[in-house]
């Protein structure tokens, strides 16, 4: 059993990875701030695809991953899938330079962690 960190694990792609690894028996840690447009997730019991209460090896941190990276000293993580990003696609990239700067900040915190 591996310990897997998934940032952005509440997003469309992330929650599919979460379920995949949970079904394989791995310990999964998700860090996600549940941004608007994520799909109406209730962190405690409203996840599409699975019910968090069905898995003892699931841990969810409802926060910006930058804060989690700054605080976490967990070096026992076997794999990290960094999927956290600002939600909005091409429109955000082309029309909101501040959101792009936020995305770069998120990535920077990941690589420094």
Residue ranges and their predicted role:
Residues 1-113:
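N-terminal Rossmann-like NAD(P)+-binding domain of SDR-like oxidoreductases, especially those catalyzing
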């Amino acid at each position: 059993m591996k310990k897997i960190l998934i940032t952005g694990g509440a997003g469309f792609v992330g929650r599919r990875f979460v379920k995949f690894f949970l079904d394989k028996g791995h310990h999964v840690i998700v860090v996600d701030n549940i941004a608007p447009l994520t799909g109406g997730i209730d962190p405690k019991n409203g996840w599409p695809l699975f019910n968090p209460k069905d898995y003892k090896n699931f841990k969810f941190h409802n926060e910006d991953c930058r804060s989690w990276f700054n605080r976490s000293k967990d070096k026992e993580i076997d794999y990290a899938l960094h999927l956290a990003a600002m939600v909005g696609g091409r429109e955000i990239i082309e029309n909101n330079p501040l959101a792009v700067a936020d995305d770069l900040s998120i990535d920077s915190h990941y690589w420094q962690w």
